[in-house]
Amino acid sequence: MSVEAQSRSGAVDTQEPADLREQVHSAARRARVAARTLATLSAEAKNRALHAAADSVLANVDAVLAANAADVDAARQGGTPEAMIDRLALNPQRVDGIAAGLRQVAALPDPVGEVLRGKTLPNGLQLRQQRVPLGVVGMVYEGRPNVTVDAFGLTLKSGNAALLRGSSSAARSNQALVDALRSALAEEGLPLDAVQLLPSQDRASVTHLIQARGLVDVVIPRGGAGLIDAVVRDAQVPTIETGVGNCHVYVHSSADIDMAEKILLNAKTRRPSVCNAAETLLVDRALTDTALPRLVKALQDAGVTVHADPTEDELRAEFLSMDIALAVVDGLDAAIDHINTYGTGHTEAIVTTDLAAAQRFTERVDAAAVMVNASTSFTDGEQFGFGAEIGISTQKLHARGPMGLPELTSTKWIVWGDGQIRPA
């Protein structure tokens, strides 16, 4: 299907109206109208649209890759680090994966309408609590074009409209993808404003999005610490923090060192630029003369720079690169204290053969996910068996951990009566 027609473009008009705030708010109002339709769509209709969107992305792969090549070229000329280039870059295999992700979302259960609990009161009133869409979901994210499609798929399946504000570094890629998605919506007779792309060249568009009270129901920032902190600090609409991951691997005195080495290397080197990568290695002081040299050598042999005398900033850093901070701790409780001081509430891991130590660690470490003898890289919606995710929440309200379809819903109480009135 063609995405030539400008009428199908999801970009907010940057010429008229001239006021950027009004542009963003106008997009949000259109999204609210679209959300009313999406909230009542059948699962079958949503699934057809998701398959159509996957087909459209594949049909327009040449346009998507050409747009992405221009983004990557501009990023390289601007001196963007290779770790960030890797996040930005698309290739035919990655586009295939993006389309496959939409089909995977189509295969997931529809959360809308799910009854969570119910009861009949003594007066005969019948109560049930069921899932309903959030409404208009704003996404603010950095240079990862796949997030554009992931966000569309998850918001559509959960009955929400999406307002997307991606990075200017991925502007061409995001536009090509949104054009393909909106083409599929048009083919299915669904509101094009189910997904809209906000201007990315002016940072003020973020401010207008996150302060659109009454128009936007929630904003989800996905990116580095600076982006997330700025959105949470300045927002006037509800936000869900995602992603910043200063994840630790603690090697307990009882650890199987072969296992510890394997877990550590996987957690650090599998994909160092993602939020569930290990950023700090904690080693029990009892292992200083035995396991520690071996673990450091294994990291260095894998190309990791080990910060053996880390600064305060390095202990708090989300490197997103082949770097890791190293700290020696005086036992289990010291490791727990260190993690609760420097961690970001994402994912923490212990390697141990001591069941009591493992239980104490899981009970006392404050994080969305706590691993025992497993890599931090498993904190992922697909790995957890939830399907795709819109991010990993590091806060405690409304959601925590990998955010899939259920986390993109709220609840509504439905009460059936037969003329009951409340006594005075």
Curated annotation (Swiss-Prot):
* Protein localization: Cytoplasm
Q: Region (Disordered): which ranges?
A: 1-27
Biological processes, Gene Ontology terms: L-proline biosynthetic process
* GO CC term (a single one): cytoplasm
Q: Which UniProt keywords apply?
A: Amino-acid biosynthesis, Cytoplasm, NADP, Oxidoreductase, Proline biosynthesis
Q: Which InterPro entries match?
A: Ald_DH/histidinol_DH, Ald_DH_C, Ald_DH_N, Aldehyde_DH_dom, G-glutamylP_reductase_CS, Glu-5-SA_DH, GPR_dom
Q: Which Pfam families match?
A: Aldedh
Pathway involvement? Amino-acid biosynthesis; L-proline biosynthesis; L-glutamate 5-semialdehyde from L-glutamate: step 2/2
Molecular function as annotated in GO: glutamate-5-semialdehyde dehydrogenase activity; NADP binding
Q: What is its EC number?
A: 1.2.1.41
Could you name the domain of life of the organism this protein comes from? Bacteria
Which reactions fall under this protein's catalytic activity?
L-glutamate 5-semialdehyde + phosphate + NADP(+) = L-glutamyl 5-phosphate + NADPH + H(+)
Q: What's the family?
A: Belongs to the gamma-glutamyl phosphate reductase family.
Q: What does this protein do?
A: Catalyzes the NADPH-dependent reduction of L-glutamate 5-phosphate into L-glutamate 5-semialdehyde and phosphate. The product spontaneously undergoes cyclization to form 1-pyrroline-5-carboxylate.
Do you know which NCBIfam families this protein is assigned to?
Answer: PRK00197.1 (NF001221), proA (TIGR00407)
The name under which this protein is listed is Gamma-glutamyl phosphate reductase
State the species of origin. Answer: Mycolicibacterium smegmatis (strain ATCC 700084 / mc(2)155)
